[in-house]
């Protein structure tokens, strides 16, 4: 059984970034699914102004999350491809921009549990990918 799981994991070239991207991709799929079932977790992210979160906006957020999880999944397996690498990196840049602008400009988020996770994941991933590009891209 362990051999099967090892056979489907991405090639890492000795690094950990592909595993991280795969993990974040899978977690994002679950986050996306929950936005279609209940808007309460989405309201936690935008907790400074949760009345702006509607079922439609939550589903749109979930769809956006699903699209980025697919890109990140491909990124986990094809980091040696410059275009895939950069596209994956852009998903984190856009996520960081979105959450920072919602917090600092639009005022729908506040620094707390709901915002900390997305901010940490997007910013750490973005910096990690910036620093490791030459290691992975052929």
UniProtKB/Swiss-Prot annotation:
It is a multi-pass membrane protein. The keyword Transmembrane applies. It holds the Pfam family Erg28. One of its GO terms (biological process) is sterol biosynthetic process. The keyword Endoplasmic reticulum applies. It is found in: Endoplasmic reticulum membrane. Keywords: Endoplasmic reticulum, Glycoprotein, Lipid biosynthesis, Lipid metabolism, Membrane, Steroid biosynthesis, Steroid metabolism, Sterol biosynthesis, Sterol metabolism, Transmembrane, Transmembrane helix. Its main location: endoplasmic reticulum. Glycans are attached at residue 40. It comes from the Eukaryota. One of its GO terms (cellular component) is endoplasmic reticulum membrane. One of its GO terms (molecular function) is protein-macromolecule adaptor activity. The chain crosses the membrane at residues 17-33, 56-75, 87-107, 114-131. Part of the third module of ergosterol biosynthesis pathway that includes the late steps of the pathway. The third module or late pathway involves the ergosterol synthesis itself through consecutive reactions that mainly occur in the endoplasmic reticulum (ER) membrane. Firstly, the squalene synthase ERG9 catalyzes the condensation of 2 farnesyl pyrophosphate moieties to form squalene, which is the precursor of all steroids. Belongs to the ERG28 family. Heterotetramer of ERG25, ERG26, ERG27 and ERG28. ERG28 acts as a scaffold to tether ERG27 and other 4,4-demethylation-related enzymes, forming a demethylation enzyme complex, in the endoplasmic reticulum. Interacts with ERG25, ERG26 and ERG27. Also interacts with ERG1, ERG3, ERG5, ERG6 and ERG11. This is Ergosterol biosynthetic protein 28. It comes from Candida albicans (strain SC5314 / ATCC MYA-2876) (Yeast).
């Amino acid at each position: 059984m362990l051999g099967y799981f090892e056979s489907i994991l991405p090639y890492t070239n000795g690094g950990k970034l592909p595993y991280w991207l795969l993990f974040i991709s899978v977690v994002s799929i679950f986050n996306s699914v929950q936005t279609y079932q209940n808007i309460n977790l989405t309201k936690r992210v935008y907790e400074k102004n949760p009345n702006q979160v509607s079922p439609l906006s939550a589903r749109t957020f979930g769809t956006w999350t699903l699209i980025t999880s697919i890109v990140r999944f491909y990124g986990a397996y094809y980091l040696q491809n410059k275009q895939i690498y950069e596209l994956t990196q852009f998903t984190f840049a856009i996520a960081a921009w979105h959450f920072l602008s919602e917090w600092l400009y639009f005022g729908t988020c506040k620094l707390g549990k709901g915002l900390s996770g997305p901010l940490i994941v997007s910013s750490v991933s973005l910096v990690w990918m910036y620093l490791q590009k030459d290691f992975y891209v052929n």
